[in-house]
Design a protein with these regions (language model features):
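Extended, non-catalytic subsegments within catalytic or DNA/protein-binding/adaptor domains
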Residues: 1-210
Length: 210
């Protein structure tokens, strides 16, 4: 079972990445959460795989992630996509990735590097080293959308699950884990402080792009 990452923890992870001069990773974490990406899919992304409003040939107010080597390629489409609806995620993508060349990678490393960074981040936040893993971004994003009222059928499309029955079981378990999860007081305090940092950063970023 992949422990779903709650939104407050996502924010904490993003602040850690920003504070260590890894802005691209902070955006990648937000994108993985919002678009229900698998860790391997995140690490293989290049700039050409993310379409953003204002890009040449792209005439839409939303963005899109194109996944060229999906896990479910044998039973579904060989090239898949997820639409980026979230305004702040789009803003972050524009700010950090807008001027990258088409074949520039969006991840600072491979999946092992991402897993290692997660272990460091967990300890830095006052959690157990392996309490949450990169796979928890997909689980957390799906659970967050489900609790916000997103129909299971929509989640299946966005998350590209092969079977509806599998997704229903997955979301049911994730929601239960998230509801019963408790974090030590030190982690809760740090996440509260980091939330304030991220709110200020996003407010400043939003103002600069208006």
């Amino acid at each position: 079972m992949r422990s779903p990452i709650p939104l407050s923890l996502l924010w904490g992870l993003m602040v850690l990445a920003l504070a260590t001069n890894m802005g691209s990773l902070a955006v990648l974490l937000a994108l993985g959460y919002h678009c229900l990406l698998r860790p391997g899919e995140m690490c293989r992304l290049e700039r050409r795989h993310v379409r953003l409003p204002g890009n040449v040939g792209w005439h839409s107010s939303v963005g899109m992630v194109v996944i060229t080597d999906p896990k479910t390629a044998r039973t579904a489409a060989r090239v898949q996509h997820v639409v980026i609806h979230d305004r702040l995620v789009l803003l972050l993508c524009q700010a950090f990735w807008g001027r990258l060349l088409p074949h520039q990678p969006l991840s600072p490393g491979n999946i092992r590097g991402l897993e290692g960074w997660f272990r460091w981040a967990m300890v830095s936040l006052g959690l157990k080293e392996r309490q949450f893993t990169p796979a928890g971004l997909r689980a957390g994003g799906a659970t967050h959308d489900y609790l916000a009222g997103s129909p299971v059928e929509r989640l299946m499309w966005r998350g590209r699950w092969a079977a509806l029955s599998t997704l229903k079981h997955y979301v049911q378990e994730c929601a239960s884990v998230l509801a019963t999860a408790t974090m030590p007081p030190v982690a809760q305090y740090r996440l509260t402080v980091f939330e304030g940092f991220l709110t200020s950063f996003l407010s400043a970023l939003t103002g600069s792009w208006q």
